[in-house]
Amino acid sequence: MKKILSNRKAEGYIDVAVGIIALMMVLVVTLNIYTFFMLRQDLDTVSGFLIETATSEGSFGEEFDERCEELRSSFFEFDVVASADEYYNSTYERVQLGDKMTVTVSVHTYVRGVGAFKIPVTVSTTRSGISEKYWK
């Protein structure tokens, strides 16, 4: 490195400039990967809370929606897709005891630090559980 900097030819300066630019690009990619991992961890937490609420209530009803809004105000804006293998009452989205319930939480974001380009990325996580409520 000392030889490159002490060399009076212009190619040494160009090599250093290209090296610094390459180092910055690696740093940007590393920070983006770290950000996506942290976002994924937050999504896992949110989906865990939501599936816990849904399975204990045995439905994707009013209490589930209230919990969604509470988590949106605490964390960030996210999309939720809730489904079940079989509904006991599809109007109220009730799921019978022992049936599988699934919650998918996703966030649409962009890769940052690449200049004028916007590269869209969707980060999502899925959790499932078994309904704990018996409907008569």
Where are these regions (language model features)?
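Low-complexity, S/T/G/P-rich flexible repeat/linker segments used as non-globular hinges
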Residues: 106-136
